[in-house]
Structures are given as structure tokens and as C-alpha cells.
């Protein structure tokens, strides 16, 4: 059974290492190593993760058989729940971990009297887009978000209505 547990501040280095492993493996082929390195340095370093925590994002581990196999982060934004990150180590995918996380997120969203969950997904992240579609998310728009130094995120915004 998958356990979900809040990431403690003292675990940020461990979180950064797992994030780097998963994100490097998954996104290098999609967005290229150079762009991915920039994004990792911006969002997945201990400093970047701490800043996101300070900005109100809640980070939780996904733990399977006492092994930290992934994590996710979310926060209320614009009257909806924003799922910022959901990453699972590739050797643990297909074990219903994402479904467990999604169920938790739905309950949390309801408990905060919100009726929608939204997220951003890279337009070329086909497998992830298919998973979110299977869960019931719909594409509501495309957007390009500059992140500095000539880099940008080319995403779809997906939304799920409870």
C-alpha cells in the first residue's frame, strides 16, 4: 500500500536528489538536457524547493514498502487546487501510486471547499497527458510561460472538475 507523508524541511536535500533523478530521466528526451538543467536548477534544488514551501506549496512523499518512490506538491490558487508537481520514479510506475495521490488530492480539494484541480503539462509529454486524460482532466488552454534567460515552459493547462 502507498503511504503519503508530508515532506519535512530537513528532508529537502533528499527530495532534491529524487527530483533530479526523476526529472532528468523523464524530461531530457522531451525538452532537451540544456533546458531541463536550467529548470532543475530553478525549481528542484534544495533552495528552489524551500522557496516553494515558503510560498505555500505542500509537498508529500509517495512511499511504497518504506521506499520514497515519488512526490507531489500542491496549493490553493485562484479558488482552485493547483497541482504543481507529481513525479514517480520510473521503476515504480504502474503500481497505482498516481491514483492514490489523485484520490488524496480530490479529498483535500473537497475539504477546502474547492471544486476544481488544475495543472500544467508540457505539450510534448504525451504519456503524462494520456494519464491525466484517463483520470478525467480536460485541456482548457495552451500557454507559454517565460522562466528567464530565454527559456520558457510550453504547456497545456488541464483541469479536473470534482
Segments (PLM) and residue ranges:
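Conserved GNAT acetyl-CoA-binding A-motif
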Residues: 109-120
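Helix-turn-helix
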Residues: 128
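Residues forming the Rossmann-fold NAD(P)(H) cofactor-binding site
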Residues: 99
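Conserved catalytic-core motifs of GNAT/GCN5-like acyltransferases
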Residues: 79, 118-122, 138-155
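Glycine-rich phosphate-binding loop
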Residues: 92, 96, 148
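Acetyl-CoA-dependent GNAT
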Residues: 6-12, 16-91, 102-104, 108, ...
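Extreme N-terminal starter segment of soluble prokaryotic enzymes
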Residues: 1-4
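Conserved active-site tyrosine of GNAT-family acetyltransferases
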Residues: 132, 137
